[in-house]
Structures are given as C-alpha cells and as structure tokens.
Swiss-Prot record:
Transit sequence range: 1-29
GO molecular function: mRNA binding; structural constituent of ribosome
GO terms for biological process, alphabetical: mitochondrial translation; negative regulation of translation
Domain of life where this protein originates: Eukaryota
Gene3D superfamilies (alphabetical): Ribosomal protein L13
This protein's name: Large ribosomal subunit protein uL13m
UniProt keyword Mitochondrion present: yes
Alphabetical keyword list: Mitochondrion, Ribonucleoprotein, Ribosomal protein, Transit peptide
Alphabetical list of SUPFAM superfamilies matching this protein: Ribosomal protein L13
Organism from which the protein derives: Schizosaccharomyces pombe (strain 972 / ATCC 24843) (Fission yeast)
InterPro entries: Ribosomal_uL13, Ribosomal_uL13_bac-type, Ribosomal_uL13_sf
C-alpha cells in the first residue's frame, strides 16, 4: 500500500496570506493576489483544481494609483437595453463604492472566467484599515509585496 494516499490533504490545504496594500501599485498587487488565489505558487497547481489560498488585504484605502488614472481610467456597465451604457471614472468609483471595489474588480479581471471564479473571489477579504478579524488564521504576512524601487519612489509622500 502506498504511503502517499492520505497526504494529499496537506497539499490542498488553504493557507491564509495577509497583504498590506499601503503605497503598492494597484495592478502589481492585483496580479500577485490573483496568482495566490489560483494557487499558481504551489507545485500541485492545475487549472481545473481549486488549490489556491485565502488572501486578506488591509490598508486598501491607501493603495497606490499612479499618473492620471484617477481621472482618465473608465469603468463601464451595460444593462442590455439600448442607450443604457453607464461609465464612471476611477475617482467616481472610489468615492461611490470605495477603494475595495477597485481592487476587487482588478483581481476579478485577472482571474480566468470559469466555474472556479466565484469560489476564488470568495476567498479574497479586503479591508480599508489595518484591522481585520482574521489575525488568528494568518500564516504568511507581506507588508510590502512589491519590492520595486520605482514603486517606492512613486508613492512616497
């Protein structure tokens, strides 16, 4: 009998990651979160298997947005009826729904649209402040996930 039969549960166990979004570029942070939610950082990754981890993001209200994206980047919504195309700038979206929705849309756009999309997005917890209720569950913590010198210079105030 093989000794590996009962050990697959450890490989598929969900690890909790804590990421601080303070002064981190939105796109870089979203791509790293999407990779973690999919499980691409694990050696057992398979596109059809749900082997990703849980991600808790804090300090989302201080996320770094460079350039004039706040005024120029547009979000669209269409109801399906003729003439009902709505558009918002990133600044209007942040004022109306908060910075959490900006990050959630960015991460959701980087995940593949398949049957696992909803399950992966439910494992993403986003908070505006530094406090969150999952401190006991956190296994890995990243306070500056992007170590680019350019990002540090762009968002230092």
């Amino acid at each position: 009998m093989s000794t590996l039969n009962g050990q697959t549960a450890l490989a598929y166990a969900k690890v909790w990651h804590h990421v601080s979004a303070k002064n981190v570029p939105l796109g870089r942070l979203a791509s790293q979160i999407a990779t973690t939610l999919m499980g691409k950082h694990k050696p057992i990754y398979h596109p059809a298997a749900d082997c990703g981890d849980v991600v808790v993001v804090t300090d989302c209200s201080e996320i770094g947005i460079s350039g004039r994206k706040l005024e120029n980047h547009k979000y669209y919504s269409h109801s399906g009826q003729p003439g009902h195309l709505k558009e918002w700038t990133m600044e209007e979206m942040a004022a109306k729904r908060g910075h959490k929705d900006l990050l959630r849309r960015a991460v959701g756009g980087m995940l593949p649209r398949n049957k696992l999309w909803d399950r992966r997005m439910k494992r993403l917890y986003i908070y505006d402040g530094a406090e969150h209720p999952y401190k006991a569950n956190i296994f890995r913590s990243y306070h500056n996930p992007v170590s680019s010198q350019i990002a540090k210079e762009l968002f230092s105030k």
